[in-house]
Amino acid sequence: MAPSKSIKSVVICVLILGLVLEQVQVEGKSCCKDTLARNCYNTCHFAGGSRPVCAGACRCKIISGPKCPSDYPKLNLLPESGEPDVTQYCTIGCRNSVCDNMDNVFRGQEMKFDMGLCSNACARFCNDGAVIQSVEA
């Protein structure tokens, strides 16, 4: 009975990490000419405008790949954002949303081992699995 709970915990962890990875990859999908264009795009999109409409109105492009063209250097991340901060928040968020929920469901010595594995998986995911775009052109 205990091994099946452990397997369920790992499967849930992997599924939720997959969802988190999808959200992380969405971050750099719009590229803008400059900071003014980026601010315009963010304001438009926050106000409810669709991504294509906001991109067209604000001199931005919607891209499908991970890197912006050289003439559209500004990504969705703020200029003062840095990879260490993003990695730290990713790890904290992953542990809080995935590992803490597992701890609430199952209790016991085996769960402590699973929590350690979950924390390690979050750290590996946030350090290696996430694609962080540079904000410098």
UniProtKB/Swiss-Prot annotation:
Keyword Signal: yes
SUPFAM superfamilies: Crambin-like (SSF57429)
This protein's record includes keyword Signal: yes
GO terms under cellular component: extracellular region
Protein location: Secreted
Gene3D superfamilies: Thionin-like
Biological processes, Gene Ontology terms: defense response
UniProt cross-references to Pfam families, sorted A to Z: Thionin
UniProtKB keywords: Disulfide bond, Plant defense, Secreted, Signal, Toxin
Cystine pairs: 31-68, 32-60, 40-58, 44-54
Main location class: secreted
MF (Gene Ontology): toxin activity
Cited InterPro entries: Thionin (IPR001010), Thionin-like_sf (IPR036391)
Residue ranges listed under propeptide: 75-137
Residues that span the membrane, as ranges: none
Signal peptide stretch: 1-28
Protein family per UniProt: Belongs to the plant thionin (TC 1.C.44) family. 4 C-C subfamily.
Protein name: Leaf-specific thionin DB4
Organism: Hordeum vulgare (Barley)
Lineage: Eukaryota, Viridiplantae, Streptophyta, Embryophyta, Tracheophyta
